[in-house]
């Protein structure tokens, strides 16, 4: 291979890398809610104190009992999470407008191969189905770490979507990732790929996986801490007390 060919390949690689690096500003914004979730998971008391200080600012009164405090903390977290999600969505749209404006158009999506359109739509549909299902199954407090914050919880749920193998451990995160990769299939044309959108999707996936691993720590997970779990820490503690009595 001639020196000119090597030079051209080097320039192409440098151009691609530069494009990807330029687009990676999106990652910190995408990682923000997961960073908050991990912090909250490890230090739930810190979030309780944060919401306690914030409540008077918004004209509310801080409840005196622990259960109501946990419920208030879940309420604040839900508002924060939805606000961040709207900001994230706006930033993703802005990213495409900057680097690949045609990717989000109907004509751009329909220009994708048929197999990508089918798989992309299926991923988005099933992903959103899981997201809706987990809210319906365990409610706001179940989704937003009520087990860690001491909020009132509904019954222990073993049905859909928790009964799906593998997926059932973290239906919401699985739904988010299915939606993400469905979107990648529908929008990653040449310009979006050159700007690094698949790379961003991989990094975003890793962030979700790390969050899921943290939440799977026995004794600290949303599933493990549920007071009504038949084989959970609360049930085992009650059994030990009964045995000692």
Where are each of the predicted segments found?
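Membrane-anchoring alpha-helices and their flanking helix-loop junctions
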Residues: 1-167, 174-245
């Amino acid at each position: 291979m001639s020196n000119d060919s090597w030079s051209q390949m080097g320039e192409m690689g440098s151009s691609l890398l530069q494009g990807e690096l330029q687009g990676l500003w999106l990652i910190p914004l995408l990682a923000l809610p997961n960073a908050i979730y991990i912090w909250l998971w490890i230090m739930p008391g810190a979030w309780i104190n944060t919401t306690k200080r914030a409540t008077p600012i918004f004209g509310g009164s801080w409840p005196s009992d622990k259960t109501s405090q946990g419920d208030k903390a879940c309420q604040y977290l839900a508002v924060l999470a939805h606000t961040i999600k709207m900001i994230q969505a706006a930033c993703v749209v802005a990213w495409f407008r900057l680097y690949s404006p045609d990717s989000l158009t109907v004509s751009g999506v329909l220009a994708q191969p048929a197999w990508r359109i089918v798989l992309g739509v299926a991923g988005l549909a099933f992903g959103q189905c899981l997201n809706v299902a987990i809210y319906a199954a365990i409610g706001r407090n179940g989704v937003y770490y009520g087990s860690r914050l001491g909020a009132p919880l509904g019954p222990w749920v073993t049905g859909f979507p928790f009964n799906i193998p593998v997926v059932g451990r973290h239906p919401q995160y699985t739904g988010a990732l299915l939606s993400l990769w469905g979107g990648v299939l529908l929008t990653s044309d040449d310009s979006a790929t050159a700007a690094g959108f698949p790379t961003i999707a991989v990094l975003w996936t890793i962030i979700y996986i790390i969050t899921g691993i943290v939440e799977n720590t026995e004794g600290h997970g949303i599933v493990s801490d549920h007071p009504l779990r038949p084989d959970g820490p609360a049930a085992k503690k009650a059994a030990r007390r009964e045995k000692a009595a």
